[in-house]
Amino acid sequence: MPEEPEKTADDKRSHLPWIEKYRPVKFKEIVGNEDTVARLSVFATQGNAPNIIIAGPPGVGKTTTIQCLARILLGDSYKEAVLELNASNERGIDVVRNKIKMFAQQKVTLPRGRHKIVILDEADSMTEGAQQALRRTMEIYSSTTRFALACNTSEKIIEPIQSRCAMLRFTKLSDAQVLAKLIEVAKWEKLNYTEDGLEAIVFTAQGDMRQGLNNLQSTAQGFGDITAENVFKVCDEPHPKLLEEMIHHCAANDIHKAYKILAKLWKLGYSPEDIIANIFRVCKRINIDEHLKLDFIREIGITHMKIIDGINSLLQLTALLAKLCIAAEKH
């Protein structure tokens, strides 16, 4: 049999998921959170970075930013001087005692003022016992090793670890920032896209760049063309156009037409959480009287709370439509 030709680096990159293919490797490539990234670039130029906790929602570049910092500080020594762990998989005390401690004890030749780096992703998933053990390890090996923790909520990190770290917070990316990156990637990949298609991806991403790129790739590979219709087929969320129509019917005090749309969404198998979350997002941007919109948002919030508490029947959503119609009647 003829030998398979050796794959070039470009061939390998073409088969990568786009979230890896377009992952930033320099600070200037990171989208959003400019002030926080600027603080980290100061650490990079000074060389002696402290222990760091970066807290923020998923898909905003927390781990990527830490990796960029490690690359600048360590250069060619990155592979042997960086330990990356996902704490949600390896959350027990044994990981700290074995993997992290052994890595901290290893001798690696680095330039003066540089340290080995332990990157802990989803650190808020670690058990309290593991965090206590980590605190001790951070203390003992502070002269040779720095720790960078990424988490969604810093409240779940124990106080002794928080007090040993510089706390940085990332916020959700704006729709404009996500859209700009999607356009850039679509041009690189030579995709056929419509404005509505990209806006649909931005709507489903909710400020999460990772989600946005995954949805873009899934739509491109599933259908080829990036249109709103194709995006919602892939992402399978309640269509915002239907929800917008439903809210307008409520604003016009027409509960029968509004309920028809709700019943259709329920029949399609969407969960109450999906329906209520998207009703809220659509209501925020819909063009209706401002005072009425505030009343609607209040009622949607109360129903959302009930659904999260577990009362997630069609009856709750139907009651919401009735309350929205009553609110509209008063205006």
UniProtKB/Swiss-Prot annotation:
Molecular-function GO term, any one: ATP binding
Assigned GO CC terms: DNA replication factor C complex; Elg1 RFC-like complex; nucleus
Effect of a null allele: Defects in mitotic chromosome cohesion and condensation due to aberrant checkpoint control in response to DNA replication inhibition or damage to chromosomes; premature chromosome condensation and precocious sister chromatid separation figures.
Residues reported to bind ATP: G56, P57, P58, G59, V60, G61, K62, T63
Highest taxon in the source lineage: Eukaryota
Protein name (Swiss-Prot/TrEMBL): Replication factor C subunit 2
Gene3D superfamilies attached to this UniProt entry: 1.10.8.60, 1.20.272.10, P-loop containing nucleotide triphosphate hydrolases (3.40.50.300)
Pfam families per the UniProt record, alphabetical: AAA, Rep_fac_C
Disulfide bridges in this chain: none
Family, as annotated: Belongs to the activator 1 small subunits family.
Designated gene of the protein: RfC4
GO BP, one annotated term: leading strand elongation
Subunit-structure text: Heteropentamer of subunits of 140/145, 40, 38, 37, and 36.5 kDa that forms a complex with PCNA in the presence of ATP.
NCBIfam families to which the protein is assigned, alphabetical: PRK00440.1 (NF001679)
Function recorded in the entry: The elongation of primed DNA templates by DNA polymerase delta and epsilon requires the action of the accessory proteins proliferating cell nuclear antigen (PCNA) and activator 1. Subunit 2 binds ATP.
Organism: Drosophila melanogaster (Fruit fly)
Keywords recorded for this protein, A-Z: ATP-binding, Cell cycle, DNA replication, DNA-binding, Nucleotide-binding, Nucleus
Localization terms from the record: Nucleus
